[in-house]
A protein has these predicted regions:
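Active-site diphosphate/adenylate-binding microenvironment
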Residues: 262-340, 345, 351
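Thiamine diphosphate
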Residues: 16, 25-31, 223-224, 233, ...
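Glycine-rich, N-terminal phosphate-binding loop of Rossmann-like dinucleotide-binding domains
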Residues: 124, 190-191, 308, 358, ...
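A short, charged, Gly/Pro-tolerant segment at domain boundaries
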Residues: 75-84, 260-266, 286, 455-465
Length: 468
């Protein structure tokens, strides 16, 4: 699952896999498998090191392949007997990964087309961004009145409050975001491509007359599904480093287009007032209350992780990113990502507050990684949206087989008590009035005691998604 996640998330990853001795192959040996057959459909490349003298070259090539173009996972198989043999060759230096560049012809073309476009739109996402490149494209878009709409699970390339922020595409998106994509006279795809999820299953922007320019280091443009006018082979870093050489005019003519896109984004991300909440069952709290309290109490540069499920729609819609990177999630719908990702994120960014939003079904997948967080001193906040079901799967059942509940109901443990058993701070919340203080105590445990904190929020099954 981790390899497939890295494949669809375009995450550079090198995995070294221990294998049986060469002499034991094809004999149904204990734990024998063929790594090329096993990983071949979801890795960029699979190596099997049968000669120790090739070790340095293979390792250098593996790290290069994992990073170049569209990043992804690379597998290196290590037969047991090879590991015991001596390497006497020359150490191969790292292979430089090219970022690509904008030619003068590219710059002239982009300057002309963006100036002439009445309704240009930047679609941003994908790998190989830096804080500097994210800031640069935001400034460019603000200066030239070009809205930026972000890819599925990539809503941290542009600060939430930037006037260039036009929201995001993918599951749970604002209907007006789809309209924006359809109405754009020119789309500049930077780092990401308009594939399955952002086009609502290959239904948006499918006209062969649609004008789309792609900025991507991936020469194959894997996943791209719309008409292509021009492909500039460059990473987001290479592209944004050339923005100062672009000469784009006509910003005033795009002001209404620009402002409307941002206003719609803000409207969609605004929480309702408590008087507008949908009635929930007794003994439950509203996720709207949770996010309202998080807005008030979290530092602006907080980092967020979430996995797969209905809880992600809440996180994607209402969490507010201000700097890149600040959002970590998965694009392949694999559950169990949120807690391990929070551990890794806190270790990578120890000075920043890390928050994970998890559903109860998703938390049950890998919640035991709290032990790892305690072991390595990685305190973070966990909000468990606990409604006693696999919500996304149940929603599909309601739609297609409304009277057949099958395999989606959960009997949960007391998540707060389990967290305390690990040595973390744990609280149970069953009503809105307890939410703000529970979050305050949890953050105090993180900041003062240095331990993770979990808040188990009991929610109504009928309120598993935000109101449209």
């Amino acid at each position: 699952m981790g390899i497939h996640t890295a494949w669809q998330d375009a995450t550079p990853l090198v995995l070294f896999v221990g294998l049986i001795p060469i002499s034991d192959r094809d004999r149904e040996s204990f734990q024998e498998f063929d790594p090329k057959a096993w990983f071949g459909t979801q890795a960029k490349q699979v190596f099997v090191l049968d000669d120790p003298q090739r070790a340095s070259r293979v390792v250098a090539e593996a790290f290069f392949q994992a990073q170049q173009g569209r990043p992804g996972p690379v597998i290196v198989g290590l037969p047991e007997d090879i590991l015991h043999r001596e390497f006497t060759g020359t150490i191969h230096p790292p292979i430089q990964v090219a970022d690509g560049a904008l030619s003068d012809a590219d710059l002239n073309h982009l300057s002309r087309e963006l100036t002439q476009a009445q309704r240009p739109l930047i679609f941003a996402g994908g790998p190989r961004w830096t804080p500097e490149s994210a800031a640069a494209i935001t400034q460019f878009a603000e200066d030239n009145h070009i809205p930026i709409i972000q890819d599925f699970r990539a809503a941290d390339r542009v600060p939430f409050e930037s006037p260039a922020n036009a929201g995001w595409l993918g599951y749970g998106r604002d209907p007006r975001a789809a309209q924006l994509l359809e109405e754009a006279s020119l789309v500049l795809e930077v780092g990401a491509v308009l594939g399955d999820v952002p086009t609502d299953g290959y239904t948006l922007r499918q006209s062969t007359d649609a004008r789309n320019i792609v900025i991507s280091p991936d020469t194959s443009l894997r996943g791209h599904s719309v008409a292509l006018e021009r492909h500039i082979v460059a990473s987001p870093v290479a592209f944004t480093s050339g923005l100062e050489r672009l000469n784009v005019g006509g910003a005033e003519a795009r002001e209404e287009w620009f402002n409307t896109a941002h206003a719609n984004h803000l409207d969609f991300a605004t929480l309702p007032e408590p008087a507008q909440y949908r009635a929930g069952k007794e003994g439950t709290a509203h996720m709207e209350t949770v996010f309202a309290a998080l807005h008030k109490q979290l530092p602006k540069d907080s980092l967020y992780t979430f996995g797969a499920g209905n809880h992600c729609i809440w996180a994607q819609r209402f969490l507010r990113s201000t700097v890149y990177p600040s959002q970590f999630s998965v694009r392949n719908g694999s559950m169990g990502y949120s807690v391990p990702a929070a551990v890794a994120t806190k270790l990578q960014f120890p000075e920043r507050t890390v928050v994970t939003i998890a559903g109860d079904g998703e938390y049950l997948m890998n919640g035991q990684e709290l032990a790892t967080a305690l072991q390595y001193g990685a305190p973070f906040l966990i909000i468990v949206m606990s409604n006693g079901e696999f919500g996304t799967i149940r929603d599909h059942q309601k739609k297609h087989f409304p009277d057949r509940v099958s395999g989606t109901q959960l009997v949960n443990p007391d998540f707060a008590a389990v967290a305390r058993g690990f040595g973390a701070h744990g609280e149970l919340v069953t009503e809105d009035s307890r939410v703000p203080d529970a979050i305050a105590r949890a953050l105090a445990a993180i900041n003062n005691d240095g331990v993770p904190a979990l808040i188990n929020v009991i929610t109504d099954q009928d309120l598993s998604l935000p109101i449209d």
